[in-house]
Amino acid sequence: MINIRKTHPLMKIVNNAFIDLPTPPNISSWWNFGSLLGICLILQILTGLFLAMHYTSDTMTAFSSVTHICRDVNYGWIIRYMHANGASMFFICLFMHVGRGLYYGSYTFLKTWNIGVILLFATMATAFMGYVLPWGQMSSWGATVITNILSAIPYIGTNLVEWIWGGFSVDKATLTRFFAFHFILPFIISALAMVHLLFLHETGSNNPTGISSDADKIPFHPYYTIKDILGALLLILALMLLVLFAPDLLGDPDNYTPANPLNTPPHIKPEWYFLFAYAILRSIPNKLGGVLALIFSILILVLMPALHTSKQRSMMFRPISQCIFWILVADLLTLTWIGGQPVEHPYIIIGQLASIMYFLLILVLMPMAGSIENNSLKW
């Protein structure tokens, strides 16, 4: 009798994706982050669902409802902090996952890569709207500043911003719609993640060498299921250390002050995972220019396949490209640091130099390095 997992219509899908999936035998721990992102997404949906049972999306009661969750709901505090810090873990995994894709040339799977970029945008939108919901000072002012960047769009900008706000300022209508979108988007992300996986399984996984591994595959289970479980345990360990010992480490103290439209916080800044993009936005004195740079700083990922000049797929055997890649990582860390600093000397000039460096590295130096490596190998 043939195994049910190979015949049942639903079990067959699971089997082909997680059990009998032919996988390269040499994929490293950098390939763990896909499954970790799946775990993060499930965790965020579950904790978010329980938070939504007690949260009220009204400007008068939103802040109090979050306080109520932490003080009066059984284990509400742990659910709230798992959700808040779970977002940070989500973005750490996301950045690692994208970085892995850049380093090992996984962007040559065009469909998978482009869906991934859409997923990144959707996740960033979800996280931004989630940050608005507790309705603290940074929530309200962050929403005001970030939605206001749309007013840079010529002719329709102001109307567009007021349409998104549902009035002439960030108020009850804005909070209610942000809650609605924050609730629905993770389910859209789940659907997109399935499409992402579908396209990946059309081609099979890449591997550190960048060479086709069709001649040598091993089943996903048990080899990579056990490896993913180890990754998941380490992820949960890191998350729980954060939640139980330093739950507010990555948050902003200003968000413990209820939103007050009459009092502007001294430094308006988003959560740490948006600081690199925020630094690029602030580095350009022109409003529209800053907004375009902000959007393009993420959208540049779509251009990666077109900017690939090397005849080798992976950076594993390309030392010049490796140097440029790690300089890019250092540059992004610099931008993240600058995004959290006040707009004053010397931070302004450092931010501007780091922003120029970011685009220069990706658009000019990486393609040049690929060509130099080709020539040095007489290819």
Curated annotation (Swiss-Prot):
GO MF annotations in UniProt: metal ion binding; ubiquinol-cytochrome-c reductase activity
Keyword Chaperone attributed: no
Cell compartments where the protein resides: Mitochondrion inner membrane
Primary location recorded for the protein, binned into one broad class: mitochondrion
Residues annotated as binding heme b b566: 97, 196
Co-factor requirement: heme b
Record-linked Pfam families: Cytochrom_B_C, Cytochrome_B
Residues reported to bind heme b b562: 83, 182
Cofactor remark: Binds 2 heme b groups non-covalently.
Membrane-spanning parts: 33-53, 77-98, 113-133, 178-198, 226-246, 288-308, 320-340, 347-367
Keyword field: Electron transport, Heme, Iron, Membrane, Metal-binding, Mitochondrion, Mitochondrion inner membrane, Respiratory chain, Transmembrane, Transmembrane helix, Transport, Ubiquinone
Sequence similarity: Belongs to the cytochrome b family.
Role noted for this protein: Component of the ubiquinol-cytochrome c reductase complex (complex III or cytochrome b-c1 complex) that is part of the mitochondrial respiratory chain. The b-c1 complex mediates electron transfer from ubiquinol to cytochrome c. Contributes to the generation of a proton gradient across the mitochondrial membrane that is then used for ATP synthesis.
Assembly behavior: The cytochrome bc1 complex contains 11 subunits: 3 respiratory subunits (MT-CYB, CYC1 and UQCRFS1), 2 core proteins (UQCRC1 and UQCRC2) and 6 low-molecular weight proteins (UQCRH/QCR6, UQCRB/QCR7, UQCRQ/QCR8, UQCR10/QCR9, UQCR11/QCR10 and a cleavage product of UQCRFS1). This cytochrome bc1 complex then forms a dimer.
Misc remark: Heme 1 (or BL or b562) is low-potential and absorbs at about 562 nm, and heme 2 (or BH or b566) is high-potential and absorbs at about 566 nm.
Protein name: Cytochrome b
Lineage of the species this protein comes from: Eukaryota, Metazoa, Chordata, Craniata, Vertebrata
